[in-house]
Regions:
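N-proximal low-complexity "stem/linker" segments adjacent to membrane-targeting elements
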Residues: 1-28
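Short loop->beta transition adjacent to catalytic acidic/histidine clusters or analogous donor-positioning motifs
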Residues: 4-7, 28-39, 47, 60-63
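A conserved acidic beta->alpha catalytic loop
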Residues: 26, 41-50, 70, 92
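Glycine-rich, basic loop-to-helix element that forms the pyrophosphate-binding segment
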Residues: 67-83, 104
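Conserved nucleotide-sugar donor-binding catalytic segment
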Residues: 81, 120, 134-222, 261
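Short aromatic/hydrophobic "clamp" motif used to bind/position activated sugar donors
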Residues: 88
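Conserved donor NDP-sugar-binding/catalytic core segment of glycosyltransferases
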Residues: 100-132
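C-terminal subregions of glycosyltransferases and related glycan-biosynthesis enzymes
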Residues: 206-293
Length: 293
């Protein structure tokens, strides 16, 4: 009987042939060997599937699946249904890991048995792999739901979670092509303990043509996600913390809209923020900053 791996690494891919080898190689190079790598090809039209076939022959820890194009949320759920590990983590096919990522995280989890999700920081790189930033956002530990309502502080490619989280609360919603990672970690934050470790655990590739379009779509998706979260988990935080989180989210969205020249929309979003926190200093500061710009 084939032994069960300790860790399952999940990689969805769609037309990322040029980066796929680097992602897979970074998993195979890990200093911790007890893992399986499940790659789901989401209907690629390049040579990704042929590349996967090469790797599968070389290493029996690699398992590959193909599906018609349905988005990475569905691809991740496909992999989750096949996963056998006690721990689950994700690596997108255009990103990669440092060689000791898994070993470091398993050591942290062993020392912290009450922690369910461990995550860290990213190094942002461009299409060619050159580093562009290490200026990471503020991240949090413990019950982090109130912080997650304001913004997603958990970087998908750096995180590792105990399998019980998925068994008890499920995987991706499968409803969105954008921000399925936020949906997952926000949901988990209603019940589980997170631990942030200030270590760079993933190289995250950002394409020039993705930045503005992805950010607009992500704000729209995140807005739907936080409202759905409040309906599904009304006791995750207090009413005051929900309102504060919503207000700060809307301030962030409004400031972004103003920064790309959509000032009228920005003011409409500021009014939404005022509805949740009419006397919030951050709301009024945001309004003043946009008005005077």
């Amino acid at each position: 009987m084939e032994s069960k791996p300790l860790v399952t690494v999940i990689t969805p891919t769609y037309n990322r042939e040029q980066f796929l080898r680097q992602a897979i190689d970074s998993v195979l190079a890990q200093t911790m060997f007890d893992f399986e790598l499940i790659v789901v090809d989401d209907g690629s039209t390049d040579n990704s599937w042929e590349t996967l076939a090469e790797y599968k022959v070389k290493d029996n820890r690699i398992r590959t699946f193909w599906q018609p194009n349905q988005g990475q949320s569905v691809a991740r759920n496909h992999a989750l249904a096949e996963a056998r590990g006690d721990y689950i983590c994700f690596l997108d096919s255009d990103n990669y890991w440092p060689v000791d990522k898994l070993q470091q995280q398993l050591t942290v989890l062993e020392k912290n048995p009450t922690v369910d999700v461990v995550y860290g920081d990213i190094i942002t790189i461009d299409k060619d792999g050159s580093e562009t930033s290490r200026n990471n956002m503020t991240r949090y530990s413990g019950p982090i739901a109130k912080w997650m309502l304001r913004d997603n502080c958990v970087s998908m490619n750096t995180a590792i979670a105990r399998r019980k989280c998925f068994d008890q609360m499920g995987g991706m919603s499968g409803q969105r092509r954008v921000a399925d990672d936020y949906d997952l970690w926000l949901k988990f934050s209603a019940s589980y303990q997170f631990l942030y470790v200030p270590a760079f655990w993933a190289y995250y590739r950002v394409m020039d043509d993705q930045i503005s379009s992805d950010k607009t779509a992500r704000f729209d998706s995140n807005e739907a996600i936080i409202h759905s979260f409040r309906k599904s988990y009304p006791n995750a935080v207090s009413a005051a913390e929900f309102n504060a989180g919503f207000a700060i989210f809307y301030v962030r969205k409004a400031r972004y809209l103003a920064s790309v020249g959509r000032k009228k929309e920005a003011f409409r979003v500021f009014f939404k923020a005022l509805g949740y926190r009419p006397f919030g200093i951050s709301v009024w500061r945001g309004i003043a900053a946009v008005t005077l710009r």
